[in-house]
Amino acid sequence: MVLYYILLPLAWLVFHIGFRVHTVGRENLRKVQTKGCIIAPNHVSAIDPVFIVISRFWGRRMLVFAKKELFEINVLLTWFFRCCGALCVRGTKEELEIIDRTVEACRAGETLLIFPEGTREKEGRFLPPKSGLFVIAAQA
């Protein structure tokens, strides 16, 4: 978790120097600064999670769902994801444990970032959402 708070300002600086960042609807995020919420955007690019976490408010950790294949790319990336608190979604009974953990985190006021389609859609079209988002929202 310490890595999360060290890398967040660094990433913010790099992305604001290298990219023109424009966040739409940021005022809606400010409304829930002190409450738990679920952010469920369309997933177009591999860099989406980074931009979303950076555009969030400082000092608030965001739980990010990541599909298991991302944890299998290499050891360094797996270590990085774990240090940042990413939740590995495997699609098995472990998913129920993740859902329970996520519901508790939302109730405790944390923010969850989940891409409901479970994958990227590079053309920007919406894919059918997976059921996990709805289960979490209903229980939280």
Question: What residues fall within each predicted segment?
Answer:
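Soluble catalytic domains of membrane acyltransferases
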Residues: 8, 17-140
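Helix-enriched interaction subdomains in cytosolic or periplasmic regions
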Residues: 1-11
